[in-house]
Design a protein with these regions (language model features):
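Conserved N-terminal catalytic/coupling substructures associated with nucleotide/phosphate chemistry
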Residues: 1-296, 301-406, 443, 452, ...
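A short, conserved structural fragment
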Residues: 465-474
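The alpha-helix within a helix-turn-helix
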Residues: 447
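Short, cationic-aromatic polyanion-contact patches
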Residues: 421-427, 475-485
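Short amphipathic alpha-helical interface segments
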Residues: 424-441
């Protein structure tokens, strides 16, 4: 929440919008309501103006109670707004220096309620928010919102235009062998491939009474050439970028044509690359050496999470990049739950629940929302810099960065390439959170808030400035940082 005693230090940004609202509600308030609800949430301030230098100043409202009454009347009119996601505590009067303003706290809408639109028309009335203000969503973003709102998982759909003979038998045989090792004596062991695929959720009976692959079955066991017929934007990409003088040093692409190109085979090809540089301490269990470590488990979880939660209709594909400083896993799609809830664990809303079930049956991936918390816990126990997420829009995209260096630059649990330390990692979310609530801050304040050294925080701030998320003003000890408005 905003520090109202220090309102002049704030500027409009992707989470704050001000309206003068003198005498009546401005029509643009509903565009902002829609944009905040469909993006990350935000705060609308009525009775506040923006000065020439972009700072905020209260100008007050003559009758704030009437504005609130009008606001509730309109927001509950479905001809104007398709859904009201606010509660009574989200709208209130705030006194600042003897002036009354109205505060409207708009939460991020749950996926079941999106799109939040105005004037009865989702095509022309759906908005989102970026650093430059409210904007009309494009057709691709609107379609994604409707897909996400569906209670059924995307990957359970039966694809009647294809039959199971199109699936890769080598991938199916490999999966069945892994499941036999993970779950010896399982009741499905003796089933034919076709019946096994139906039990697994990889195939189902269509309206024509015949057996066809599901979307999950096609993604898991299909060939890339068939997958792109259903998911035109489907693309899997793994790169190793160790040398700045070359574009990449190793690469795996689903479209290369020399392997199946499905997500099952991609997972194991990529995991084998990622785990090659993990240092394994000498440990025996009985007479057998144990080569698995918590870091191995965390990387498996992160890779599975990326595959399971990707929106395969989305643009730019699924990308995994390994550098000497970090492992980056990026997938198309928006967060389906709040990031803080995902980090806390206990709740899961996977985009592709059938894919999750398939990986779970071969002991890959966690259930009950424990995957992301376990990644953070393992990274902390190893003394590595904290993982962080980046979320972007137009198109929607989630990126998880796993730093593989330590704050003190001591020898890492993972050694990749040379020993050059990484700086593009840390508590990015906490820095952005603090700047949202406090409008501006010095590196020393952010260091105290995040528990990191000031020098480390300055490195992260430099990264955020280069990325365009944060702006810096002043020099040396007087330098302050703000979210880009």
């Amino acid at each position: 929440m905003i520090d109202f005693s220090n309102l002049e230090s704030y500027t409009e940004n992707n989470r704050i919008e001000v309206k003068k609202a003198q005498g009546t509600l401005p029509n643009s308030i509903w565009e902002t309501y829609s944009s905040f609800a469909n993006t990350l949430g935000g705060i609308i301030l009525l009775g506040v103006a923006e000065t020439k230098n972009k700072s905020l100043v209260p100008i007050g409202l003559s009758d704030p109670e009437k504005l609130i009454k009008d606001f509730w009347y309109i927001i509950n009119n479905q001809n104007k707004i398709n859904i009201n996601i606010l509660t009574s505590s989200d709208v209130f009067i705030q006194e600042i220096n003897g002036k009354s303003i109205v505060v409207i706290n708009v939460p991020r809408a749950q996926r079941f309620y999106k799109p939040v639109y105005i004037n009865g028309n989702p095509v022309s009335g759906t908005y989102r928010r970026n650093g430059e203000g409210d904007y009309h969503v494009n057709n691709e973003e609107l379609k994604e919102m409707y897909r996400e709102a569906n209670v059924k998982a995307q990957d359970i759909m039966i694809i009647e235009a294809m039959d199971t003979s199109l699936l890769c038998s080598d991938s199916i045989n490999s999966y069945r062998q892994r499941m036999k090792l993970s779950r010896p004596g399982h009741i499905w062991e003796g089933l034919s491939d076709e019946v096994f695929l139906m039990k697994l959720g990889a195939a189902g009976i269509g309206a024509d009474g015949k057996i066809h692959p599901t979307a999950a079955g096609l993604l898991m066991f299909g060939y890339e050439s068939d997958i792109v017929r259903k998911f035109p934007n489907y693309f899997l990409d793994y790169r190793e970028d160790y040398d700045n003088s070359t574009r990449w040093t190793d690469r795996i692409q689903s479209s290369s044509g020399d392997w199946s190109g499905n997500v099952y085979d991609f997972y194991f090809r990529v995991y084998n690359k990622l785990q090659q540089d993990i240092k394994v301490p000498f440990k025996l269990e009985g007479n057998m050496r144990i080569d698995d470590t918590p870091v191995h488990m965390a990387i498996r979880e992160a890779l599975a999470n990326c595959i399971i939660n990707a929106d395969y209709y989305g643009r730019q594909g699924l990308v995994v990049i390994k550098t000497k400083d970090s492992i980056l896993l990026s997938n198309p799609g928006d967060f389906r739950i709040e990031l803080d809830a995902a980090k806390s664990g206990g709740y899961s809303d996977p985009r592709n629940s059938t894919l999750m079930k398939m990986f779970n049956l071969i002991d890959i991936g966690e259930r009950a929302g424990s995957g992301i918390p376990s990644i953070y816990y393992i990274w902390e126990k190893q003394g590595l810099n904290e993982p962080y997420f980046r979320q972007s829009f137009e198109p929607n995209r989630i990126t998880l960065v796993l730093p593989i260096t330590k704050d003190d630059d001591k020898k890492s649990a993972i050694k990749i390439g040379d020993k050059k330390s990484a700086i593009k990692s840390a508590k990015i979310d906490r820095i952005i959170e603090y700047l949202t609530d406090h409008a501006e801050a010095k590196a020393s304040e952010l260091a105290e808030y995040s528990g990191l050294k000031a020098s480390r925080v300055r490195d992260y701030l430099k990264f955020l400035v280069e990325e365009g998320t944060v702006t810096a003003e002043g020099s040396n000890r007087n330098r302050i940082y703000k979210l880009k408005s």
